[in-house]
Amino acid sequence: MKNIFFVLILLTSFNSHTQNFNNIYADVMKIQQNSYADVKELYNEIVKPTYKDEEKVYAIAKYITENISYGKRAKFPLNTINSREGVCQDYSELFIALCDIAEIKNYYVSGDGRTSVSDIGFYNSNHSWNVVEINNEFQIFDLTWAAGYVDGNNVFVKSFNPFYFNPSPSLFILNHFPDEEKWQLLNNPVTKNQYINQPTYDQSIYNLSLKTGIVRDNNFQI
């Protein structure tokens, strides 16, 4: 048996211009659970008049990830709001509906989302996420994966993962491949063949904020 030491060179989970939105999140967490007659009614509860565009986006994203669980297809944004569940398409469509009210440019992106080593070698356009344009910059949001994950018993576990609010495109491409190349947002796009044959990365690695570190596994054997 040998102890294996891995030296990992890690990027921070958040790019340099990501701000601290804790005050915005605190406002969102105060919103009471209600039934709504229309999407605009919810929007008025989420977004305060003083919010800047980026703050509006993060408030909307935080509300959705805190209040919507992965479950049955809702089909319409208002259904998603009131049933408090949906699939990835519902997360994306509700985000679009709220961003449209805020008059923020946003885009629906479909593509492949990888969650298992069994996905290696295959491509399946089975997922959706969003891109917003703020101050002439594109930002990626995957609210489904930010809201939580499906465990080994196929049960959705609510667990906020802030990595999927504006992740670096170079990290996002490790487990997301858009059907349209332009939404990679990379200067040197990855080919589909490169993507499907690369390793699958566990989402937990993105939560590490160390730039360098040593990870030790005393149980690893070769």
Predicted regions: what they are:
Residues N3-F14:
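Sec-dependent N-terminal signal peptides
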Residues Q19-V87, E93-A102:
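Secondary-structure boundary elements
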Residues E93-L171:
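Hydrophobic/aromatic-rich core segments of domains that either
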